[in-house]
Amino acid sequence: MMDDKHGRYGACDRCRGQKLRCVGAGKPIPNSSSRLLRNEIPCDRCRRAKVECYSVRPAPRRAASNVKEQMIATQAASERSSSLAYHTSGPVVSPPNSLVTAASKPHPNSLSFNHPRSDAVAAPGGLQTRRQSRDTDSLGDMPSMPHEWMAYLHDHKMDDRQGLGMETPPLIESDLNLSRDPAMDSMHEHNMMMELIHQDHQEEWNSGPPELEAYPDPIVPPNPAPLKARKLTSPDCDDYPYGHTRRSSHTPTQPPEPAGRSCIQELAQFNEMLLRDKCSLEDTSARRGYKDSWLSIGRTLHHCQQFFSILKRIKYSRPDSQLSADRARSQWSSLPEGTSLADGAPTDSPQARRSLARGATPCSSSLARSSSTSSAASTSYLGLSTLLSILFCYTYILQAYEDILTSILHAVTRPTPTIPPTLSGLRIDGFQLDGHHTLQLECLLHVSYNLLEKIENILFGSAGPEELSNPVKYGILGDKLSAGLIDALFEHNETNGLLHCQGKREVAAKRLIREIQAALKQLDL
């Protein structure tokens, strides 16, 4: 320990913060409680290191011009501290003796740290007790300076967080908590608890009816459907009667995509492709001045086959396919033999066939009732866009076939008939069909007729029952009577061409195929 004449009554804060022994200046400090005097006379260690020697907080970078400015700053700080203590109703600062005694108590959670605010220096033996008693006597003899003590406490808090440039040890935090008001702390905790309670209450969903004041527009009434949907789809709980709730699983379960939806998407893509082909063919025909029909035979066959595969998947993926068949079987089994249509003719009479050919809709008969019921049931699951896509694709394919078959029929029935090549490059198990134009045309007609017949059966169902034991199989667009929607596009001016095979309605493409086949039999080429 240093001598009294060459030492200080208390170590400077820089040396005390670094756990170093503070070497005093040449002459002792007459009043160690004065911050200005301790900053005025640095210790030997700080002077050799050429750093500012401070006790409470670092001295300003520029040297003070006079002591009067520093006293004014100290007085202003003391006034702010006194006003703060008055407004917060804090307790009066205890005398220096009690402050030193309270500061000398070790923290219960501390193991090896001494209190940083005590003036005692760690030394062997009983030197620390003698140093503390000497400091206590000197502090008790000095005059009372309340404003400087308030400034000291205020600067003490600022120095712990800024001056030392290090984290505040738990001992200093306990020293700062000595002057707190427990009533204010309890009030602060009470306010925080009330804020948490009010916050939880605001996040809670209001299950009552929505208020009109919450909606700025008085004309549009509030829709409680989104609120109800939010309540029902809450990930926390599900609604149960009697106020019980069940915790739902947070793992999202996505329903598998039905097969019918993928088929409908494929149909939409096929529809877009046909639209592009139609636009390109129209542009090509406008530039060349004629319709390039024969060059589109293979493309038309490909479109027809693809459309048939899509319709077949849609048919077997619909939910009421088996139900419609059972309903149709029960309806046809209940019909007595010789049931009349709207005009009073039996179903197997020529008059009934002519009424079907004219597109009559016998709504008063049980046959029409069963047809309309099955048509509504079968098309209920198809949307409007899907229905229009099916009609457009079918109409486009029929129009392409009509263009191709009409040009072939004109070539076959002219005064000097010729059979054009239709399926060039076709091979049947190594047998080349090139040069055999008649075989090519017969293959084209046979394949096209079968594809069109299958598409027609899927769309409108099979033909009417020849016997009561065979029930009607309805298509995805209804029964065979609905074929008039398509036939009207191609058979405006022809009335005799609609009658074929017990009054069945047929499209113009199938009629052209039959006429070409009849012309080939007459030519014998």
From Swiss-Prot:
The lineage of its organism: Eukaryota, Fungi, Dikarya, Ascomycota, Pezizomycotina. Disruption phenotype: Leads to reduced growth and sporulation, but does not affect virulence in infected mice. Impairs the production of isoquinolines. Keywords: DNA-binding, Metal-binding, Nucleus, Transcription, Transcription regulation, Zinc. Residues 95-115, 327-337 have a biased composition (Polar residues). The keyword Acyltransferase does not apply. This is C6 finger transcription factor fsqA. Residues 80-142, 204-260, 327-371 are annotated as: Disordered. Residues 12-53 bind DNA. Transcription factor that regulates the expression of the gene cluster that mediates the biosynthesis of the isoquinoline alkaloids fumisoquin A, fumisoquin B and fumisoquin C; as well as small amounts of fumipyrrole as a shunt metabolite. The products of the cluster lead to a brown coloration and are important for growth and conidiation. Its main location: nucleus. Induction: Expression is induced by the cAMP-dependent protein kinase A signaling pathway. Coiled coil: none annotated. SUPFAM superfamilies: Zn2/Cys6 DNA-binding domain. The gene is fsqA. One of its GO terms (cellular component) is nucleus. It is found in: Nucleus. GO terms for molecular function: DNA binding; DNA-binding transcription factor activity, RNA polymerase II-specific; zinc ion binding.
